[in-house]
Amino acid sequence: MSTDAELQTISGLSVASKSAPSTQTEGVTASGKVESTTNAEEATSDVEEEENPLVVAARDGNTAEVKRLCESGSYSVLDTAEDGVTALHWAAVNNRISTCQYLVEQGAVVDAKGGQLNGTPLHWACRRGLVYIVHYLIQNGADPLRSDVQGYNALHLATHSSNVMLLVYLLHQGLPVDCQDPNGRTALHWAAYQGDALSVDVLLRWGSDVKITDTQGFLPLHWGIVNGSRNSLARLIEEGSDMYAKSSDGKTPHVMAAEMNTTAQLEGALDDCGRFPDGSQKTKYFDARTTNLLCFFTPFILILLGLVLCTFCGPIFGIILTVATLFGSIKLLKTLVLPSLYNGHAALLKSPFQAGIFTGSAFWVTVKYLTSVLPATFASHPILNFFFASIFGLAMYCFFRCMSMDPGYIPKLSGITEQKEVIETLIERGEFDTRHFCFVTYVRKPLRSKFCRQSKRVVARFDHFCPWVWNAIGVRNHRMFVLYVLFLQIGIPLWLALNSAYFGELLEIKRWDPLEFYLVIWISLQLIWITFLSFVQIFQICRSLTTSEAVNLQKYGYMGADDYSSVPLDHSAATASAKSVMNAHGHAAKSPCFSSVLKLLGVDQFVATAGEAIKHRDNRSWKEKNPTDSGAGTNCFDFWFPNGKFDLLAVFEAGKGGGAIGGHAVDYYKLWDFPDVSPNQQQTNNRSTREDGEALLAESQV
């Protein structure tokens, strides 16, 4: 069945399958073997292909053999099969960059049309998502706006490939984002139909129109409903898709969803966009600032209310009433407050509610300490009070600094021209993939950086997003965050010791303070996640790992996840862009509710980290696989004193990207390659090498 025939069938809703259309691709593997496909692109017979030495050599990337055959005079780069297919077609579709370069240099026609689809080498490469081949052909005159017999240009075919990096590249070449095929479908229609949320997002941010209809009257939203990708549907709805638009046969998105059995996905997407299941918009009662303030200060009231209920109703009924009040308050927040700014099932976790839990707890600790504990214990335990007050004050200082500062955002580029220059540089280095380029912000990603979904920015040396401080943890505030956690780890036991003395004083005078007693229990519970977090952070610092890197290591191993790289094996810089654990990305499937609880308490990462510690305790190959690990001592010194000087006051300072790896000063905003931290190299590069970066670190202090 052809692509258009398949779409016609689906538009009539007479099929049950919701898989993406079989966009006709050349049936040749990278190894040179012909695949069994349903398309007829390769019109040349199998026998002829196998017997044509030039085709075989071009397909296999044997440039030396191609050169020998052409120079012998027996074959020419202009030779074509009966259907017009050339050696350049086969080299292009099999990602043979060196062979393509030789053929083009010898005069091969870059826009030669061939095959039953009458496609050019560029079309063949686009169907496979081969960025480097596409780049080379366009640089040498290939026309990306030329269409094949089905009316698809390079942008349509790139969308069919689902390689988001190729889509980004072509858009930066100036191709119209909403060019339509003969059936009126834009690249956005195709991306939505395929359920390709990444491509949908890229096209929408580039300005693709969600209101364009095809010849059947289908919006991209209609085609998205056929596939049922919740993320794709949410983005289309966010950008203004008409929830009540009818197709030519009179079907609205809701009717189509019911017939295609994707109603749950559509309603989930509507919820993610702050809409009711019928598509109407939820009322927004507050502005962004008021919404955040309400979410932040609500825990202050809930904590006090819980303490009062336990005090006057007893522990059992008090806890029951407190839990009921908590759920009621959260329901109220989700109904009246959160829709003004946050939507979806994780709306509460996106808000500053958890930061409010910590701050509210600290606030009531301060109130009770100043009004009850301090007056009763200062005379008998002055030193203990001094240490607690100092540690608690430092913890709160680090908390607010960590919460309010820039964690290390990579600066945005000024415009498309600068973005295009970055893309060209990465292609030249063989690094145009999601490890080195952010397709959301269009910035080059330094090593160890990552895109933060909450802030929508790339963060240098990204560790994680912490809901307890409501900020990303990156190169600038990571030390402050670890200090905050460690001060809490020390301060809470000191506070418990003070309360032990306080209750001893009360017993002597036959009095009791139930409010303080329940506050002690509440704060003691906070010590659980703080202990887990302290262990994880200290362990990872000793291993020179960030939390993001550790999580990706546990999910995908050292090779990481798919990075949408299509770098040819014979690219001049292919070996320089070997995979590493540092910038992998992806998602793991877990039970949403249980997983959220584990993440909030830090249990999941604690268990995983403990497992890694046991697994690698005697594994010396770890250092060889982790390019930043120079041993626990050096790793810790690099983290706490990146300027190479043992300066305790400098620990509290935040830089602007300066750091150290294995004794080498680095700028995490421009870390394109890891320094050599191998044992032999370290012997020849002593601590004095840090002096080279002291100027950078000194300038970056704030």
Swiss-Prot record:
**Active-site residues, as the UniProt record annotates them:** 466
Q: Which UniProt keywords apply?
A: Acyltransferase, ANK repeat, Endosome, Golgi apparatus, Lipoprotein, Membrane, Palmitate, Repeat, Transferase, Transmembrane, Transmembrane helix
Q: Predominant location of this chain?
A: membrane
Residue intervals of the DHHC domain: 436-486
Q: What organism is the protein native to?
A: Yarrowia lipolytica (strain CLIB 122 / E 150) (Yeast)
Quick check: keyword Transcription in the entry?
no
- Decide whether keyword Isomerase is in the record: no
The protein's matches in Pfam families, at most eight in alphabetical order, are given as: Ank (PF00023), Ank_2 (PF12796), DHHC (PF01529)
Q: Could you say which protein family the record assigns here?
A: Belongs to the DHHC palmitoyltransferase family. AKR/ZDHHC17 subfamily.
Task: Give residue spans on the Lumenal membrane side.
Answer: 376-379, 501-518
EC no. given is 2.3.1.225
Domain of life of the organism encoding this protein: Eukaryota
Q: What is this protein called?
A: Palmitoyltransferase AKR1
Q: Which reaction does it catalyse?
A: L-cysteinyl-[protein] + hexadecanoyl-CoA = S-hexadecanoyl-L-cysteinyl-[protein] + CoA
What subcellular compartments does it reside in?
A: Early endosome membrane; Golgi apparatus membrane
Q: Where is this region: Disordered?
A: 1-51, 679-702
